[in-house]
Amino acid sequence: MNSNQKLISFDLKAEMGFFKKPDINDGIYLTYNMLHKPALLGILGAIVGLKGHEKEGVLPEYYCKFRDLKVAVQPLASDNGNYTKEVITYNNGIGFASNEAGGNLIVKEQTLLKPSYRCYLLLNTNDETEKRLYENIMSYRAEYIPYMGKNEFGVWWINPTEYSEFKVFHFNRDFKISSLFRKNEAVSKYIVKSSLFLFAKRDEKPTFIYFEKLPVGFNEEHFQYDYADFVYSNILFSKELTVDDSTAFFDIGDSQIIQMT
């Protein structure tokens, strides 16, 4: 690897989180379960001091700077990829709420409880902003207060780690993927059948597979999310698994494979 490339990870934690979906169900604003790339880039922007959304129809500074950054996300302390959610009701008596009956707007939001994610970044320290991001993460420093999707859901991080021995994974053996990964087709035909078991064996966890369609970036013409299908699983996959050419798989040691998008 280029000596100026650094692969690091850090564990993001919050008491609550809300990654707003564009749709509403029975009057409730829904949240994505997983931390997606656009939301992560916003957190990175806060850490390094880049500006956010300021003007309608203009992409935020942090997104313009980090859109091509390779990242990976691994859920922590989840129930097979799922986090506990609770619907919280807010009363809004200002602004547009004055047009509502009684002058009070009731907002209901599905909220993640105690979400935590290990975030991997592939940084180029020749770039001044990425170098500053690296230094801030490793020293627990942020220019602005980062949050888990909403201003009131402050986030902190622990366990910043640098991987000195990481290498490109060449699909020369069967493997498990520690992070979320993008799928191009059904992954079921690539499962190593002998790795499947429904009940725990000794210290092993029952196998599971979790799917979610997540934002991967912004459509710059319509200023809406672009999406991709993601998988999170502890299943062993065969080396014939097909992957998106725009992504990169890395072996970071201790039999851990991650996909960076």
Feature map (PLM): residue ranges:
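Sterically constrained small-residue positions within well-ordered secondary structures
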Residues: 1, 62-64, 110
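N-terminal, Lys/Arg- and Ser/Thr-rich interaction peptides
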Residues: 1-29
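Extracellular structured ligand-interaction cores
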Residues: 5-7, 68-70, 114-118
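Internal, well-folded beta-alpha domain core
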Residues: 76-261
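Residue-level recognition of well-ordered beta-strand positions that form the cores
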Residues: 11-13, 72-74, 120-122
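Glycine/small-residue-rich interface belts in oligomeric ring/scaffold proteins
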Residues: 23-95
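Short loop/turn segments at secondary-structure transitions that flank enzyme active sites
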Residues: 15-18, 50, 77-79, 125
